Structure formats: C-alpha cells, structure tokens
Curated annotation (Swiss-Prot):
Function: This protein is located at the 30S-50S ribosomal subunit interface and may play a role in the structure and function of the aminoacyl-tRNA binding site.
Protein name per Swiss-Prot or TrEMBL: Large ribosomal subunit protein bL19
A cellular component term, taken from the record's GO annotations: cytosolic large ribosomal subunit
Keyword check for Nucleotide-binding: no
Protein species of origin: Paramagnetospirillum magneticum (strain ATCC 700264 / AMB-1)
A GO molecular-function descriptor: structural constituent of ribosome
Ribosomal protein found in the keyword field: yes
Highest taxon above the source species: Bacteria
InterPro entries per the UniProt record, alphabetical: Ribosomal_bL19, Ribosomal_bL19_CS, Ribosomal_bL19_sf, Translation_prot_SH3-like_sf
Transmembrane intervals: none
Length: 148
C-alpha cells in the first residue's frame, strides 16, 4: 500500500517539475521565489527574496521557509516546494552554515544576522550543473516548438 502511495507521489512530483525545475538549495542560501499572485481577474508574478532558514523534505509535501526583513520587520513565509503557485525558484547566493534550521536568526539584527557566503568548489560545480540542466531543458523546449 505504501509503495503505491510513494509511486503516485513520485509521478506527481515529476509532473509538477516538468515545466519548471527545482534547484538544489539548502538553509542559509539566499533565494528569489517568484510567486503567482491572482488579483481579481489579473495574474502577476511577485518576487520574494530572502534567506532560506528551514527546509522540510517530505516528498510531495516538501516545503521551505524564507525570511526577509521588510521595512524593519522580519517576515517569514512558508512555501510548499511543489506548489503550482510558484513560478520559479532562483538561488541568488549560497550560504555557509552548520545548522539545518536557522531559527536563531529570528532573534538577530544587523551584522550578527549575516551569513557567510560559501566559497568552496562544490557550490560552483552545483551552479554549473544547474545551468547545464536549464540549458538542456530550454533546448528541448525549442526543439519541441520547431516540431510543432
């Protein structure tokens, strides 16, 4: 029974990520999440940029928390990872942290809330791999458009 549920979740994840890839990111990374906002009969995309302070990996129910400071107030927003309301997720910079949950940032302001940028070669390799994947997806879309 559980295997059937896992299989269905896997299929749904593949279907939801077919048009937009989900980049690999971790707590400490600065993310730009483009969210689809519907106002009346208009739909627009709103950017939400902040630090990922937590990530919950739970298959289709995976989510992540992004924190930013807006007009001097800390604002946190929980995003379901595979939500159709998320247009795209972009990693702005990779942070170097030693915790999985960065809830201690809630109590910090200013310089003490800064996160060091990751300078290891691994982040460069990950970024290069993501760019290559994005280019491959774009090429596939162009090829599909030419066929039609």
């Amino acid at each position: 029974m559980v295997n059937i549920i896992e299989q269905l979740e896997k299929e749904q994840i593949e279907k939801l990520t077919a048009d937009r890839g989900v980049p690999s990111f971790a707590p400490g990374d600065t993310l730009k999440v483009n969210v689809k906002v519907i106002e009346g009969n208009r739909e627009r995309v709103q950017a939400y940029e902040g630090v990922c302070i937590a990530r919950k990996n739970d298959g289709l129910n995976s989510s992540f928390v992004v924190r930013k400071i807006s007009y001097g107030e800390g604002v946190e927003r929980i995003f379901p990872l595979y939500s159709p309301n998320i247009a795209s997720i972009e990693v702005v910079r990779r942070g170097d942290v030693r915790r999985a949950k960065l809830y201690y940032l809630r109590d910090r302001r200013g310089k003490s809330a800064r996160i060091a940028e990751q300078t290891t070669g691994h982040s460069g390799k990950v970024a290069a791999a993501e760019r290559a994947d994005a280019a491959a997806v774009k090429a596939a879309k162009v090829a599909a458009a030419k066929v039609e």
